[in-house]
């Protein structure tokens, strides 16, 4: 491997970092973004490690790779990368990447005010608002989301027995609602929730096989959502989302918000069209809604949800990858813990 360079746009969505690669990314094989994701995982995961992990990234880094559209009707494509892996979908990164692409003039949408984006989980349509050259909000309609399992009983050492709902919003989420052994996320530290989130992921994986009913390539649990009382009086819920071994989402989590909207709708706690203000650990917020109901090819009932949020560009960066340097392809502290 020779010295390689990447150009990235840096920013954040409601407090959660988004690093969007706009130059230097590998050419991927496949007719769809799902197939190209599989090619990336098999042959190019060093790119993710290099840009997401230390020393160029950190334990909570998240990002995308900007690609030309795969479909004729799309404006561009996105591949989602973060410390935990290459994801089928990431909502906060979608909001950020759409805002960045428009503000930095990487794309001229076919329909002003609307963009269509190819992603591994499918195709999403987003509407955006502007004030001059600034994108002030992005509202995207996510892939079909659904409640896969309810009241799955698991046990973790710190809290004992828990009942979790498993919902899909582009990724699978065990959702831990307030219950006897869990009084709410506001009662615990982020470090505690991170450690216990890893335990929940393992416990769910031991309890059952989690597979998308229409797409067996989407499987397994790499997230956990701890819920609790919101900070603001006008918010409806709060969540601390854990991804993989080390990431604590600073935003309310886009795919997690879609999963929670789908869960609440399936349980009768949310009506179609009703706004759900979802707070994060730091009090930032997304607005989620059930836009319509759909049925998957497998016959599973699902919803099309929209998630609305804001993002900001903080700069541009050039990254140099020299294989002769130590830790050139990134490292995680977790790799050095027995």
From Swiss-Prot:
The record's listing under InterPro entries reads: Pro_racemase_fam
Reaction it catalyzes: trans-4-hydroxy-L-proline = cis-4-hydroxy-D-proline
Enzyme Commission (EC) number: 5.1.1.8
The active site annotation covers 90, 253
Query: In the record, what terms sit under GO molecular function?
Result: 4-hydroxyproline epimerase activity
Q: Which family does it belong to?
A: Belongs to the proline racemase family.
The name under which this protein is listed is 4-hydroxyproline 2-epimerase 2
Quote the function comment for this protein: Catalyzes the epimerization of trans-4-hydroxy-L-proline (t4LHyp) to cis-4-hydroxy-D-proline (c4DHyp). Is likely involved in a degradation pathway that converts t4LHyp to alpha-ketoglutarate. Displays no proline racemase activity.
Kindly list the positions annotated as binding substrate: 91-92, 223, 249, 254-255
Matching Pfam families? Pro_racemase
Keywords of this entry: Isomerase
Q: Main EC class of this protein?
A: isomerase
Which PANTHER family does the annotation name? BIFUNCTIONAL TRANS-3-HYDROXY-L-PROLINE DEHYDRATASE_2-EPIMERASE, TRANS-3-HYDROXY-L-PROLINE DEHYDRATASE
């Amino acid at each position: 491997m020779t010295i390689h360079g990447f150009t990235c746009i840096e920013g954040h969505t409601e407090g959660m970092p988004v690093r969007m690669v706009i130059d230097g990314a590998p050419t991927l094989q496949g007719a769809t973004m799902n197939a190209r994701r599989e090619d990336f995982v098999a042959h190019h995961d060093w790119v993710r490690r290099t840009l997401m992990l230390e020393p160029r990234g950190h334990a909570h880094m998240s990002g995308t790779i900007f690609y030309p559209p795969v479909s004729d009707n799309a404006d561009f494509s996105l591949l989602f990368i973060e410390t935990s892996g290459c994801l089928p979908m990431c909502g906060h990164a979608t909001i950020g990447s759409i805002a960045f692409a428009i503000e930095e003039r990487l794309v001229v949408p076919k329909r002003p005010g609307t963009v269509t984006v190819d992603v591994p989980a499918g195709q999403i349509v987003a509407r955006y608002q502007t004030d001059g050259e600034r994108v002030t909000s992005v509202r995207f309609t996510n892939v079909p989301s659904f409640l896969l399992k309810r009241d799955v009983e698991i046990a973790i050492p710190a809290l004992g027995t828990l009942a979790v709902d498993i919902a899909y919003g582009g990724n699978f989420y065990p959702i831990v609602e307030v219950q006897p052994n869990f009084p709410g996320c506001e009662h615990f530290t982020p470090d505690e929730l991170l450690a216990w989130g890893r335990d929940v992921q393992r416990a769910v994986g031991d309890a059952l096989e989690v597979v998308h009913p229409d797409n067996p390539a989407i499987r397994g649990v790499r997230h956990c959502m701890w819920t609790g009382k919101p900070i603001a009086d006008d918010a409806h819920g709060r969540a601390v989302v854990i991804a993989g071994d080390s990431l604590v989402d600073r935003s309310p989590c886009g795919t997690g918000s879609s999963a929670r909207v789908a869960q609440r709708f399936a349980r009768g706690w949310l009506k179609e069209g009703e706004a759900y203000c979802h707070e994060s650990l730091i009090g930032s917020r997304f607005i989620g809604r059930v836009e319509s109901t759909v049925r998957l090819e497998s016959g599973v009932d699902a919803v099309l949800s929209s998630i609305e949020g804001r993002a900001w560009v903080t700069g541009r960066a050039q990254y140099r990858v020299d294989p002769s340097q130590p830790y050139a392809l990134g490292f995680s502290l977790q790799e050095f813990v027995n």
